[in-house]
């Protein structure tokens, strides 16, 4: 053994060839934390000191190569002064450079995934051989930063600036065949031939058949582009990427600027440019929020995994109620490998559900994400039925009938008599109390809520609602099934609206107050979209459905009359009474036309102004900042109440629920992180400025206490 550490070992393989193996003890994956970086330095020094070494193969002792940096260390590191961050990155790069500058050839053998620092380690090698099932990429822009271990320097010099910009700015994982096509790797082999492939390359380099020094040289030099080529490549890319990323996500464009600025430098000077830009991005609030989101997502996955121990395996599912929603649920279950019965009382609803599933599967085939054979397999896993004949062996039933408590209670009681005693019943409801629905059941311990968001195939969140009598097994089994469907489940306790809708309706309440104060809804939409929402509140209500919003508002007003009941008519009342129901019937706040692709396109319709006129009670002058605060303050305060009331267990789950469920701007991190970014004391003072708007704007006593004590939601 030439070197042995807790993360890295170096041992002789054969005739002067050594294997530098990453295998971080006590972890399921390899990552670049302080320990690993320090051991890499020591391992490289040990190789340099051993004259018998003729070549180095870099490998992993785990199912994946290296997943990247240890993100948990970013939180503390990024609080350091900018100069210290720059120094830290340059020190790390000295280690990578020392490996790259070894007097012997080097080959990286890539298995599983090599992301971020993992791929950057491979780029420092002379050759790369990749398993045909592996994926590689530089996903740092998703964290609000860009690659900091030489990725913006080595990758453009290896695969060309255009390809490198595409890889870095998109942050996507790339398949082996695509990596080979652009020259990011030198060979692709079957997983079982990975070491043999690496040995073949290293032996050919040692023998002189391959000139490893010539292969290494372009990575040490400036980019081979003249001034005109540089201008065309970089200016075009910056314009395109800025349009794609939008103004709130600076990292992709900053990555291009870094590549451009370093284009005329050799490796060492180029790395200084990279380090300076990396440190600048690391200090932004966007990076703080996106890293916080990543860590919150990891927390969600840990909590969901904790349910696995007691969860029952779902081998056969069923959905009650076909149509678009039932078809979406059936599709999601089947495409992820769980066969599902789809029952309805009407043949036409069954057909609608099957058409929906077939359409979604067909779309995946068209995009190359699914083979026709897999599509047929998924369709065969959806069994339509008008009866309960095959329900005896079902493990979980998702009830997705009309949003009416009496209908749901009747259907749930009926199906309970048709399934085995330990089958789980889950109601897909957005507002109806799980405790209320449970009253119709003989086995309420087997009953939970399972709230899917529309469209099911696109929305990542599922709220699993625990009722007063729901057993832990029922909750755990539903969480496990949601995960199996490829969703991100969050367990919440029962209350009107659960987490997401309970928080969303105060936001809509702020919007209603603005419209009643004479503020143009088109202006409100533009302001909130600029703030970062995927769509403004008027457009969102049209998409959700004015009738759905009207019903939800009434449910919330009944549940929380002290702050959500408004005696005055609102914009939603006026539109509902005028039968302007949104996209579903072509007119809501906006009117809708069909575009060339057959999708609804919103257009302004002046007739809506007459409909809204009776509910405008005053003409207030408000700034854009007022518009944001009228809507965001009640949303944030309701999120605080959900946490205080125990509806959601942690701040991380609350924030992720809003990001995944209603598209809360990710670069702002969620409602509670948004409060933290303002400062809890400052947020309380801000809310107090709008106290005259009603109880939705009144901070809780506990929040005032947090403000007084200088506390935060995330430390």
From Swiss-Prot:
Disulfide bonds: none annotated. Residues 1-190 are annotated as: Enoyl-CoA hydratase/isomerase. Pathway: Lipid metabolism; fatty acid beta-oxidation. The record marks 120, 140 as: Important for catalytic activity. Substrate binds at residues 297, 501, 660. Its EC number is 4.2.1.17, 5.1.2.3, 5.3.3.8, 1.1.1.35. GO terms for biological process: fatty acid beta-oxidation. One of its GO terms (molecular function) is delta(3)-delta(2)-enoyl-CoA isomerase activity. It holds the Pfam family 3HCDH_N. The active site is at residue 451. NAD(+) binds at residues 325, 344, 401-403, 408, 430, 454. Residues 312-715 are annotated as: 3-hydroxyacyl-CoA dehydrogenase. GO terms for cellular component: fatty acid beta-oxidation multienzyme complex. Keywords: Fatty acid metabolism, Isomerase, Lipid degradation, Lipid metabolism, Lyase, Multifunctional enzyme, NAD, Oxidoreductase. It catalyses: a (3S)-3-hydroxyacyl-CoA + NAD(+) = a 3-oxoacyl-CoA + NADH + H(+); a (3S)-3-hydroxyacyl-CoA = a (2E)-enoyl-CoA + H2O; a 4-saturated-(3S)-3-hydroxyacyl-CoA = a (3E)-enoyl-CoA + H2O; (3S)-3-hydroxybutanoyl-CoA = (3R)-3-hydroxybutanoyl-CoA. Heterotetramer of two alpha chains (FadB) and two beta chains (FadA). In the N-terminal section; belongs to the enoyl-CoA hydratase/isomerase family. NCBIfam families: FadB, PRK11730.1. Involved in the aerobic and anaerobic degradation of long-chain fatty acids via beta-oxidation cycle. Catalyzes the formation of 3-oxoacyl-CoA from enoyl-CoA via L-3-hydroxyacyl-CoA. It can also use D-3-hydroxyacyl-CoA and cis-3-enoyl-CoA as substrate. This is Fatty acid oxidation complex subunit alpha. The lineage of its organism: Bacteria, Pseudomonadati, Pseudomonadota, Gammaproteobacteria, Pseudomonadales.
């Amino acid at each position: 053994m030439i070197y042995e550490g807790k993360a890295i070992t170096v041992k002789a393989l054969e005739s002067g060839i050594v294997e530098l193996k990453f295998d971080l003890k006590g972890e399921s994956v390899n990552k670049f934390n302080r320990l690993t970086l320090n051991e890499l330095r020591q391992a490289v020094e040990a190789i340099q000191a051993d004259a018998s070494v003729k070549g180095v193969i870099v490998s992993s002792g785990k199912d994946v190569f290296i997943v990247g940096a240890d993100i948990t260390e970013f939180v503390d590191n990024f609080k350091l002064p900018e100069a210290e961050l720059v120094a830290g990155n340059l020190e790390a790069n000295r280690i990578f450079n020392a490996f790259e500058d070894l007097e012997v050839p080097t080959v990286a053998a890539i298995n599983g995934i090599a992301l971020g620092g993992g791929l950057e380690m491979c780029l420092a090698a002379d050759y790369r051989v990749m398993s045909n099932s592996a994926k590689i990429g530089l996903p740092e822009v998703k964290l609000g930063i860009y690659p900091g271990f030489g990725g913006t320097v080595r990758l453009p010099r290896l695969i060309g600036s255009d390809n490198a910009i595409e890889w870095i700015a998109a942050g996507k994982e790339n398949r082996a065949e695509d990596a080979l096509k652009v020259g990011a790797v030198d060979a692709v082999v079957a997983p079982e031939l990975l070491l043999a492939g690496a040995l073949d390359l290293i032996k050919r380099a040692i023998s002189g058949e391959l000139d490893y020094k010539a292969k290494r040289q372009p990575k040490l030099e400036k980019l081979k582009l003249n001034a005109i080529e540089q201008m065309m490549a970089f200016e075009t890319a910056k314009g395109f990427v800025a349009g794609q990323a939008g103004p709130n996500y600076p990292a992709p464009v900053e990555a291009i600027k870094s590549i451009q600025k370093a284009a005329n430098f050799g490796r060492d000077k180029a790395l200084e440019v990279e380090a300076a830009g990396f440190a600048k991005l690391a200090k932004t609030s966007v990076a703080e929020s996106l890293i916080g989101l990543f860590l919150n997502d990891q927390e969600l996955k840990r909590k969901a995994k904790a349910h696995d121990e007691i969860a029952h395996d779902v081998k056969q599912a069923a959905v009650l109620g076909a149509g678009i929603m039932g078809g979406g649920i059936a599709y999601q279950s089947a495409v992820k490998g769980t066969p599902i019965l789809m029952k309805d009382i009407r043949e036409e609803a069954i057909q609608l559900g099957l058409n929906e599933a077939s359409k979604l599967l067909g779309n995946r085939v068209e995009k190359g994400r699914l083979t026709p054979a897999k599509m047929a397999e998924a369709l065969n896993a959806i069994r339509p039925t008008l009866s309960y004949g095959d329900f005896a062996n079902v493990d979980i039933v998702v009830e997705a009938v009309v949003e009416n408590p009496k209908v749901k209670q009747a259907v749930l009681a009926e199906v309970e008599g048709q399934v085995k005693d330990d089958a789980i019943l889950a109601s897909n409801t957005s507002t109806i109390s799980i405790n209320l629905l449970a009253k119709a059941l003989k086995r309420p311990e087997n009953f939970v809520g399972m709230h899917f968001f529309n469209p099911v195939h696109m929305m990542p969140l599922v709220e699993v609602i625990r009722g007063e009598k729901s057993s832990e097994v029922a909750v755990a089994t539903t969480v496990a099934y949601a995960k199996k469907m490829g969703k991100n489940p969050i367990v919440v306790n029962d209350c009107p609206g659960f987490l997401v809708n309970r928080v969303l309706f105060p936001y809509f309440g702020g919007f209603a107050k603005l419209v009643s104060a004479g503020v143009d809804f088109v202006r409100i939409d533009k302001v909130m979209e600029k703030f970062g929402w995927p769509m403004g509140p008027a457009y969102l209500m049209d998409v959700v459905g004015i009738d759905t919003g009207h019903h939800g508002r009434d449910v919330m007003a009944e549940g929380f009359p002290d702050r959500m009941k408004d005696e005055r008519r609102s914009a939603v009342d006026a539109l509902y009474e005028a039968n302007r129901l949104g996209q579903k019937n072509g007119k809501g706040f906006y009117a809708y036309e069909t575009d060339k692709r057959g999708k609804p396109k919103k257009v302004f319709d002046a007739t809506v102004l007459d409909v809204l006129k009776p509910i405008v009670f005053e003409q207030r002058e408000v700034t854009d900042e007022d518009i944001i605060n009228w809507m965001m303050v009640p949303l944030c305060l309701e999120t605080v109440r959900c946490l205080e009331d125990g509806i959601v267990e942690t701040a991380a789950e609350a924030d992720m629920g809003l990001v995944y469920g209603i598209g809360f701007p990710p670069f702002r991190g969620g409602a509670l992180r948004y409060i933290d970014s303002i400062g809890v004391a400052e947020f309380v003072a801000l809310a107090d400025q709008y106290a005259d708007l009603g109880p939705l704007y009144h901070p809780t006593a506990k929040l005032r206490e947090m403000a007084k004590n200088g506390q935060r939601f995330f430390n």
